[in-house]
Every structure is written in C-alpha cells, then in structure tokens.
Amino acid sequence: MTGTTLAATYGPISGADLEAELAQPRIADGDAQDAAVYERDGGAHAPPFASGGAPPDGDRADVRRAAGAGDASVRLTRVSKRYGERAVLADVDLSIGRGSFVSIVGRSGCGKSTLLRLVAELETPSAGTLVKRGDGGGALDTRIMYQEARLLPWKTVLQNVMLGLGRRAKDDARAVLDEVGLLARANDWPAQLSGGQRQRVALARALVHRPQLLLLDEPLGALDALTRIEMHALIERLWREHRFTALLVTHDVQEAVALADRVLLIEAGRIAFDQRVPLDRPRARASAAFAALEDRVLQRVLTGSDAAPAAPNAAGPEGASRGRAAPASGLRWAV
C-alpha cells in the first residue's frame, strides 16, 4: 500500500478542529496539495493558533502552588457561550496558573468541550473576556489533542508529526517520536499502528511545536484500561519535563485525579466545584487518600451537591477534611 493510494481513497477531510489545527501551518509550509484540501473544506478560515516562545523555566512546585493565582496563562472573566437561544456556558470565571495541570469533569452536554474550544479559540465567547498570556506577556502557543488521533493516512508517522513544519524540523520530529517511544515506527503508516500508538503520534505532533498550553479533549477515551494507564504516565512525564500548562477534559474521574493539580466540575454551564489535588506524584492510585479524593469528586458529580466528605488533608476551596472518608465507589465515569 502506498501513500498515493491512501490519499486517493481517503476522500475529503472533515472536521473543523483538525483543519484549524493544521491548515495555517501547512499553507505556510507551501504544501499546495494538502493546503488545497483544507482550504476546500473551509479550514483555512479557522482561527490560527498563536505562536510563542518556549515554556517558562522555574521550580515546578512553585508553579503548582501558584496555580490559579497571579501568574495565569489563561483567564476567563464572566464568559458565556450561546448557540441561538441555548445557553451552554454562563458567567464562567476561571484562572489557570502557568505550568499547572487542570482537569474538567461533568456530565455529557454540560459544556466541558465548549469551554475547551473557547480556550483553543476555535469558538468565540458570546459575552465576557478570554485572555491568554504566554511567557513574558507574549502570545500563548496552543495545541490540542482529541479522542481521535486524526492522522493523515497517506503520510508516514514521521510526516504526520512534521505537519505544519518545514523539512528542517525532521530532527525535532524524530526527537519527539523518541520521547513517546515510537522512533522505530517513524516510517510506518498510521494504519499499521494500534490505537494507543496512534495517540502517541498525535501527542508527538502537538509537542513538536513546544506548546505553552496543551489542550486535551478526552484523548484517551477510546483506549483500553492498561493503555490508558500507560498514556497517563507518558503525559505526566512529558508535562513535568516540558513544563507546559495542561487542560484536560475527561469523563473519567480517576483519570482527572491521577493527572491534575486541580479538578473542576461544570454543571449547567457553570463551574460548580473546584477541588485541589494535594497528592504526591506519581499518584498512588491504591492509596486511601487517592480513593477518598476520587470518591469525593465522583459523588459531587453524581449528586449535584457538595455532600461527600473531603479527602484527608485536602486543601482547597472546599475546606479541610470533615471526618472519615467514605470508601471509593467502583464507578468512576462521570457521564
């Protein structure tokens, strides 16, 4: 099977998200054939991502303590989003600290992905202000990763990682493939990879740009449990090494607690719950503290009220522990 055959049988590319992510870089790179496909589908008119410098240096513990404080990379003030008469988000106030890892959970249709699309500038707020500030006050370079890897099947793994970049980026692309453990598959086609491997390629494609903000829209939802845990470890390791800000949307409460410094719950278009995660990394999922915190978040999602006891030593907007924590529920999907 050749790349030409794959290109001929793939058909038109659909999905404004993919187009917005890749169209502008591909046009700038001069790949006229691929750019024509994106342009035909309207992708060239989607808002381009801002370019920026490298993520800030500094002590990660200090960065985490500052999450949501003065040094914010993303700030939303009274942001609302409507589609016609339907209000999806209403008066959202949110500050995301530079270098922090924030997870967003909530029931289906609550506005999680809409909030992510606003931060990605794939949508514009109906009201309110959104400010994204990069290192030194410049533009905040932003990349996004979806549940579907969205790889171009007529391009090799290496070529997919290099999308939007010139040929001089080949060494950088190979280096980031090595970081995600797929350098040996650089010349393979996407169809030859497993689902988890395709997501690793998608992650590499985002990280090769050295973003300051990485948005994750349920990127692991279609993977099996063991592959998800492996991907959790990979994402956490790369986050700690590259020091970008991460915003994750997920239905999986355990995933949210395992990865984030802070878990937000969206209900009826508003941030209804803001829970800090004061657990050491890497997270010990079998520990009582992890189980109690997971259960607290899950019960809050399911009941719609902050009635569950706090995790031991949990410090956050909800206050300190209020007694012995209940056992963790076997259910961890907030649907």
From Swiss-Prot:
What is this protein identified as? Aliphatic sulfonates import ATP-binding protein SsuB
Pfam families per the UniProt record, alphabetical: ABC_tran (PF00005)
User: ABC transporter domain: from which residue to which, for each copy?
Assistant: 74-293
Q: Quick check: keyword Transmembrane helix in the entry?
A: no
Localisation: Cell inner membrane
Question: Which EC numbers characterise this protein's activity in its record?
Answer: 7.6.2.14
- Entry's InterPro entries? AAA+_ATPase, ABC_transporter-like_ATP-bd, ABC_transporter-like_CS, ABC_transporter_ATP-bind, P-loop_NTPase
